[in-house]
Amino acid sequence: MKLKKLLLSVLMLLSISGLQAQSLSPSTQIHWDKGTLVIETPERPTDQQHVLGLTAPKMETVRVAFVGLGMRGPWAVWRFCNIPGVEVVALCDYEEDRAEASQKYLRDASLIPADIYSGEKGYETLCQRPDIDLVYIATDWNHHFPVAKYAMKHGKHVAIEVPSAMNLEQCWSLIDLSEQTRLHCFILENCCYDYYEMNALAMAKDGVFGEIIRAEGAYIHELSAFWKSYWQDPNDNDTDNLHWRMKYNMENRGDVYATHGLGPVAQCMDIHRGDRFTTLVAMDTESFVGKQYVENLTGKEPKEFRNGDHTTTLMRTARGKVVEIQHNVMTPQPYNRLFKLTGTKGYATKYPTPEYALSGDVMKDTAPNMDDINAHSFLNDAQKEALEKKYYHPILTKFGEKGRAMGHGGMDYIMDARLVYCLQNGLPLDMDVYDLAEWCCLSELGALSMDNNCAAVTFPDFTRGHWDEMKGYKHAYASAEEEEATEAKAEAYTIAQKEVAAAANLWTLYDNVKNAADEKAQDKALKIYQRAKAKAHQQLAKKLKVKK
């Protein structure tokens, strides 16, 4: 009770000082037990069931709307324009011109123009539409949760950029919504789809490293060149002109961006699929660089800078394994996500160069010169090439080549294409709402640890008792016949969409609306465009019906 009062006092003080300590939840129930801070797991309401292995009916066409079109959102629109069987229905951003700018990707792909939404509550009008299946959220962090919550309450699946939830209260709310609505709540963790991580996952699942007993992950990325590029929310009381991300770091302690490092190693360690995180301890440095940045910008030293320059979180699992996660966006050093797996038979490490070390005859009959393998040194190039060829992940086989052509290392496209694949085939998604909660809760749990002299803090069981029912992490696949049929329908849809858009001359009519001389002319042009677009959708439905 004393701790609860202390936390509430801290939150009130931060509120009075203008800070929004979003990594702390007033609703979190906590108590001490023998020096450990115990986070209580709320009971599941009687009318809810878990969503492990959740599926939704197959979608021949995935109708998607995008909310948040600043830094990452526009590239997501571009990627979806290159995935067959998708219709981009709507584009939304607080600033209308940013939403409008992303139309160029649909224009370049000769697709039907999307509808535009803007303003503080534009996403609410968007979510009320009946013709949207998926809302793809790439806003600033503060808006991830409210947009997702509203979308799910209006019957939409959601895919949320990271971090998808900022505290435990938001984690539990998304879990309850997914369980109540039976809708997917997908964390857009692209690093789970990078090539080295996917191949290492395939190796781990086949026992190449033996039992994985320890793992490391990180987000180490000096962001000094980006701080001013982040959006400045006019409603966020940003009087010091910090822009949202630096402001969030100043106001919040803990690993506020854990998922890039944690997601891939959690999959390798079967988290909530036979094991679960039970306890963490977090420790951070003082803020040296962050605090100095604010002082240089404002001319005065900040009263408080909550986020340390480097944060380290150690976690233990129910099966006695350990994971270490680091966060540093302040100090100058090469980009690094660590990704290290320590197993009873081998070791994998991605940075600074991707390597493997194996013991015994793990690679028997796989690569040349196997007699001299031992774990005292990394595999040579020929051995490494043979290992990666043998364990090249099936998802990379399907999407990897096009992914590389789409930029950013390919992992973003692979993530989006795989998401659409699962929705079109009615399969469980690769990450569920429990993954989202487990990977995003480090911010609040770590802050609680560090605010209490780096005390041990327990994890709640986000599955509420079901973490040991699924044995091992795995991806779901359709049969070859089902894949072929689904892909044929998807390709046919995209071809037909392009044909009706061209036949109706939609982009010329769209431009007529934008270039109208006055309001009266614009109203007239808008009516002509809307009639043509409605007719194009009717023609599209007819084309697809004939092809069936």
From Swiss-Prot:
Keywords for this protein: Glycosidase, Hydrolase, NAD, Signal
Cofactor note: Binds 1 NAD(+) per subunit. The NAD(+) cannot dissociate.
Pfam families: GFO_IDH_MocA, Glyco_hydro_109_C
Cofactors named for this entry: NAD(+)
EC class name: hydrolase
Superkingdom, natural source: Bacteria
GO molecular function, one term: nucleotide binding
Function of the protein: Glycosidase.
Name recorded for this polypeptide: Glycosyl hydrolase family 109 protein 3
Organism: Phocaeicola vulgatus (strain ATCC 8482 / DSM 1447 / JCM 5826 / CCUG 4940 / NBRC 14291 / NCTC 11154) (Bacteroides vulgatus)
Organism phylogeny: Bacteria, Pseudomonadati, Bacteroidota, Bacteroidia, Bacteroidales
